[in-house]
């Protein structure tokens, strides 16, 4: 398998209004997490942190030049493996235990991490052979109705279980923008995880349909939909 240098592991795409997409282009699309950086006047938010194979802080030092809230949309390995790099870590109570004590089973890493996940490796062939998600206990628990105040913009927490019990989305009412986590994305439905619940999933989708959404920034597949 191809080897790529660590400084090529991430790609960043800057959108409008202080929103940036970070992703790992050498992770195959089905497994690739879209990480969203949202810039505010006083602090920033990073929604999810990817596979953890390469350090976000080392390769993208601008992420921590300002106060940063690292939010876990849920605690599957491909969304939280970089969370240990950040001082402020936010998660829903239903999955806080996984963030604090992750293993190959509760994060789904054992089921998915392998050759089929990658187009290339970051300077270490078979580096996933000893892959593990490092513990990153939540420093703040967030739930339905909580608000992340960035100074000049506000993100409201929506509890959207179904894909997992502690799944959350972030809603910016002022711009009608939804950061949907894995509850809405452009790709095949994957709802056979040990803690997925289709009834909860349907209920979450129904409540999201009531929002006046203009833009969805999803976590898998095509980054944004209008």
Which stretches of residues belong to each language-model region?
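Conserved beta-strand hairpin/beta-sheet module of binuclear metal-dependent hydrolase folds
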Residues: 8-62, 169-181, 185
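Active-site HxH/HxHxD metal-binding segment of metal-dependent hydrolases
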Residues: 51-148
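A general structural motif
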Residues: 42, 65-67, 213
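Basic/polar N-terminal segments that are highly enriched at the extreme N-terminus
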Residues: 1-8
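Hydrophobic/aromatic beta-strand patches that form the interior of the parallel beta-sheet core
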Residues: 20-22, 69-71, 90, 140-142, ...
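Short Pro/Gly-enriched beta-strand edge/turn motifs at strand-loop
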Residues: 16-23, 126-131, 151-153
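Metallo-beta-lactamase
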Residues: 44-46, 51-52, 133, 137-140, ...
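Active-site micro-motifs of SAM-dependent methyltransferase domains
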Residues: 21, 78, 96-97, 166, ...
